[in-house]
Amino acid sequence: MARRKKYEGLNPFVAAGLIKFSEEGEMERIKLSPKAAIAVSAAIIAALIIINLLLPPL
């Protein structure tokens, strides 16, 4: 039987080959505070509600 490599300590996406980087740490992440994330999502929800009220459905 063939041996399987154990991917200990790796992200599942990296282990599955879905992300191909030489190192997992190369991915850049957007740093956003929890308050900012809530504010942005609330603003998007409010904008969608306003658009829905102003524009009649087709």
Swiss-Prot record:
Assembly with partners or alone: Component of the protein translocase complex. Heterotrimer consisting of alpha (SecY), beta (SecG) and gamma (SecE) subunits. Can form oligomers of the heterotrimer.
Parts forming coiled coils: none
TM helices/strands, residue ranges: 34-55
Keywords of this entry: Cell membrane, Membrane, Protein transport, Translocation, Transmembrane, Transmembrane helix, Transport
Membrane topology qualifier: Single-pass membrane protein
Organism: Pyrobaculum arsenaticum (strain DSM 13514 / JCM 11321 / PZ6)
GO BP terms in the entry: protein transport
Protein name: Preprotein translocase subunit SecG
